[in-house]
Each structure stands twice: as C-alpha cells, then as structure tokens.
Amino acid sequence: MITIAFTRAAMRLAAGAALVVAPTVFAGDPPAQYAASCGACHSVGVAGAPATGNVAAWAPRMKKGMDAQVASVRNGLGAMPPGGLCNSCSDEDYAALITYMSTAQ
C-alpha cells in the first residue's frame, strides 16, 4: 500500500512538473507531444503503464476501443492522473498519442 501511495504521489508530482516545464501542446506532432508528456512513464512502462511500442502490452487495452482508451486518459487510470501529463490535449490529441504509443516504433 505504501508503494502504491508513493507511486501515485510521484506521478502527481511529475504531472505538476510537466505542466510547468512543458506547457506547450504540439498539436499534430505526436512524437513531440509524447516527449513532453506521455514519455515520462510510457517510455519504460513505469507503474504498470504499457511501454511505448510494446504491441503485446497494448493489445488488451486496444481491444476495448479507442473511445475507452481516450476516456482512461481523460479520467485517469491507476497511477496515471486525469489528463495523463497533457491536460491541454484534446481527445483527438489523446487518440493520436495512444496510436503512436501502441504501435511498433
């Protein structure tokens, strides 16, 4: 339980730092958006996040459909805070980022 609480606290801290350090949204440029937000956790699969490019890890999530994936980002899931680390992203941005992360790199 302590580990989970610490992980969530660390994620919230990272989310706040990302908003201060990288407030710019890179609309239409998923790799740049990813580097400024999602990559903090998804680059290596921190706290249960499926790693970018790991198609097998993303497969069960993608079976739920893109709308469900976007809702998970918007509302938060597990250690991921609502909005991920891109609170200024639109649903279309989230969908592009999910597509980018869930495909082989």
Label each PLM-derived region with a short phrase.
Residues 2-15:
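Bacterial N-terminal signal peptides that target proteins for export
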Residues 37-44, 97:
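The canonical Cys-X-X-Cys-His
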Residues 51, 69-95, 101-104:
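Axial heme c-ligation environment in periplasmic c-type cytochrome domains
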Residues 22-24:
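N-terminal signal peptide c-region/cleavage motif recognized by signal peptidases
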Residues 33:
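Flanking scaffold residues of small Cys/His-coordinated metal-binding clusters
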Residues 42-71:
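Gly/Gly-Pro-rich "capping" loops immediately C-terminal to redox-active cysteine motifs
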